């Protein structure tokens, strides 16, 4: 049982790291930070705002793919060059940030 828990924790840490790496690779971190507002909102604030929303992953994945404006201030977020799977992966990761 202890080995299973260790493997599960290490596996989840790897997923979190991989998604942060994807965010860096795609340029997301140029405007966003995990905990502090930059040009765009902190990912922790995004996660808090959409916590409990049933369609949060799909909603955020759509915003990542298509861009958006007016939700977090006057600076629009341009559409991002990501696949549907990458957008969903990033959205799930963002929503996991505390």
Curated annotation (Swiss-Prot):
Binds 1 heme c group covalently per subunit. Heme c binds at residues 28, 31-32, 77. InterPro entries: Cyt_c-like_dom, Cyt_c-like_dom_sf, Cyt_c_ID. SUPFAM superfamilies: Cytochrome c. GO terms for molecular function: electron transfer activity; heme binding; iron ion binding. Residues 1-18 form the signal peptide. Keywords: Electron transport, Heme, Iron, Metal-binding, Signal, Transport. Pfam families: Cytochrom_C (PF00034). The keyword NAD does not apply. Reacts with hydrogenase. Belongs to the cytochrome c family. This is Cytochrome c-552.
